[in-house]
Structures are given as structure tokens and as C-alpha cells.
Amino acid sequence: MKSIIVPVDFSNQSEKALKVAASLAKEQNAELFVLHMLELSPAIMGESGYISQEQVVHLIKLGEKRFSDFLDKPYLKDITVTPVIKHYKVFSEVAEVAEKHKADLIVMGSNGADGLQEIFIGSNTERVVRTSDVPVLVIKGNEVDNFNPKNFVFASDFEEESVPALKKAKKMAELLGSKLHLVYINTPGDEFMSTNDAYAKISKFLDEANVGMEVEIFNDYTVEKGVINFSKKIGADLIGIPTHGRRGLSHFFMGS
């Protein structure tokens, strides 16, 4: 791992993400690119004449000063930190910055509720995930002093298009020193599969991925509940969910 992107907005949650990113950067000897979206409305930008260009420059400088102060953290010492400022709140730019700097990982904070759907669907996080080919690590909940995940759950529908995501998850688990647990959530209704059919599908997927790993089939009422309950069962520290291109994560929770 050579470079990590972490978008920040000065919130407590984004600082938690920054701490995790710093911990990973230090452990992996990676460069940390800290991205701040300095949002300026058309009025502030001067397009409607409500504010002078001098005032625009002043506001930009204030934002840059606040960003600089935010990065004055003891846990960022001895890490190569490159601040990046964008003047528009366009979340696709996160993916563009990641591509420009050949990032191996994007780390983001989330203020989502307890459920997985509330964290992802329609959120800023999903906007980034949907436009990024780079793995996105979402940090939520309590402060994380030492990011050292022991158990990493990868939940998938085991469709062929998820093969690249599994390979990235496997590589990430190896980098983090985590044990990777693969799980298929089997739910009632139209999506229900017999054990034999499910294992046939999974076996075909693993052959395609050229990965020799065990997969657990976990039954639950919804995919979301299944992922959470399985993760609790094994004491997971990290959950990985593949996205399918522009559809983002919504397909994963359909009907749940």
C-alpha cells in the first residue's frame, strides 16, 4: 500500500477516519493525501454579484487556514501528509483524486445509523463508492486508537461481476493481517436458494476467481440483518461489501 486518500470536513467522524488512515499509513509506510472539499456556492463564487472577488479570496484563505490547523495533529507526525483542496463539493472528485495519486485505499467517516442501509444508500459515502474503483474503508462508531482488524467479513451475492471485489478484499485482508470470512446471505422469498444450488453457484464463482476459500451460507430474514448477525457471530471488526458499477450498493439490499 503506497497511498491513502481521506476526505475530511472537520467533523468528529472525519477525524476518526483520519486517525485510522494515519495508523494505516504509518504501518504500511504509505503517503496520506488528506482531501477537503471547500464548498463555495455560485453566490460566493461571485457569479451573481453578491460578493466581491476579494471577499471570495478571503473566504478561501480562511478555509485553507482551518484545514491547515485541522492537520496539526500529533498522530500525523512522521507520516508523509499531502493536503489537497477542491473548491466544489462534487463527490466524484474523490475518485478522481484517488486515481490521480494512484491511491490504494479511500478512508471515510460515516454518521450513518446502526443499519447498513442507513450508512450507505443515498449517502455521500455511496456517492464515493459508486464512482470509485479503489476500495473504500468506512469508519463509524467509537474512536479507533489502533486499527487492527482481526476478522474481516466479505458478504457477496457471488455473481461473476463481484470477482474483482473479492480479489481486492483478499489483498486487503493480507495487508491488514486479518482473517477473511466469506459469507452468502440466504433469505426467504424469490431470492431463496437451496443449499445445493447455493454451493453450486459459489463453487463456480470461486473457480472463476481462482480462490480456494470456504464460504458460509447464513440464513436470515434480510440481507442486511444477515450481514450484521453473521458479523456479530464471528466477532468481525470489518465488513466488506462489493458494489456493482453504477448501481452502487442498492442492489445488495433490494428486498431487505
Where are these regions (language model features)?
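Structural motif
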Residues: L35, V84-K86, I119, I139, ...
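Small/aliphatic-rich secondary-structure junction motif
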Residues: M1-I51, K150-E216, A236
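Gly/Ser-rich helix-loop-strand patches that form or flank binding pockets
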Residues: S3, S23, E27, V94-E143, ...
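Intrinsically disordered, low-complexity Ser/Thr-rich linker and spacer segments
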Residues: E143-K150
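Well-ordered alpha-helical segments embedded in enzymatic catalytic cores
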Residues: R66, E93, A165-K168, G226
